[in-house]
């Protein structure tokens, strides 16, 4: 592969961007953050599923920019809350991206719910669109755990301080980055996604 594959990472979330960049092969792919593109558009995330939101963000941004775009949608689904907060994870308490308020609301919603009924999972859906707005690749990853009764740890973001990994008896907020990267929903989705992406890059390079 002589030419770098130009790929826009279609997320405005700086912390998600860091995770994506850490796992994507930058020796093969020229990564550009959405924040680095002046004419990027804001895509309304009004889908009822993570996959619908990821596809919409990827295809609409790709058509607008006429570039390859990788978009991601992720969130937390709690068993006792019938899957909530789900696609509303980032704005569960009303304001988009207010992690503290979202965590506080989740704890209130689970008041008096025993630990054996506090099962939950993080979900991640990745979608790659070509410059014409066609979905070329899509992959998902999940990570099962439980919701703690109080926040622990200052690492990570979002609901990480509440999400307990049973095997480690620690929250994502307490685990070191290496362990979290091995276990997280985003990492699991990327491990499935990257080999497919590299095959597509190879094919694109060969046919160019």
UniProtKB/Swiss-Prot annotation:
Any single biological process term in GO: purine nucleoside triphosphate catabolic process
Domain of life: Bacteria
Protein name, per record: dITP/XTP pyrophosphatase
Record bears the keyword Transcription regulation: no
Subunit structure: Homodimer.
One term under GO cellular component: cytoplasm
Keyword line: Hydrolase, Magnesium, Metal-binding, Nucleotide metabolism, Nucleotide-binding
Signal peptide (from-to): none
Reactions performed catalytically: XTP + H2O = XMP + diphosphate + H(+); dITP + H2O = dIMP + diphosphate + H(+); ITP + H2O = IMP + diphosphate + H(+)
């Amino acid at each position: 592969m002589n030419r770098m594959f130009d790929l826009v990472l279609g997320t405005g979330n700086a912390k998600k961007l860091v995770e994506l960049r850490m796992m994507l092969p930058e020796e093969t792919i020229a990564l550009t953050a959405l924040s680095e593109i002046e004419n990027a558009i804001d895509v309304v995330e009004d889908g009822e599923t993570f996959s619908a939101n990821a596809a919409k963000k990827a295809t609409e941004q790709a058509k607008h920019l006429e570039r390859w775009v990788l978009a991601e949608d992720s969130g937390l689904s709690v068993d006792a809350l019938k899957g909530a907060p789900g696609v509303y994870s980032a704005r569960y308490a009303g304001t988009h991206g207010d992690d503290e308020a979202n965590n506080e609301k989740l704890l209130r919603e689970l008041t008096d719910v025993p630990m054996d009924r506090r099962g939950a999972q993080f979900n991640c859906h990745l979608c790659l669109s070509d410059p014409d707005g066609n979905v070329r690749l899509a992959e998902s990853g999940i990570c099962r755990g439980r919701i703690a009764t109080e926040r622990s740890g200052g690492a990570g973001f979002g609901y990480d301080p509440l999400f307990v990994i049973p095997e480690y008896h620690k929250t994502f907020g307490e685990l070191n980055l290496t362990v979290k990267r091995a276990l997280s929903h985003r990492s699991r989705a990327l491990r499935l996604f990257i080999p497919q992406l590299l095959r597509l890059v190879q094919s694109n390079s060969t046919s160019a």
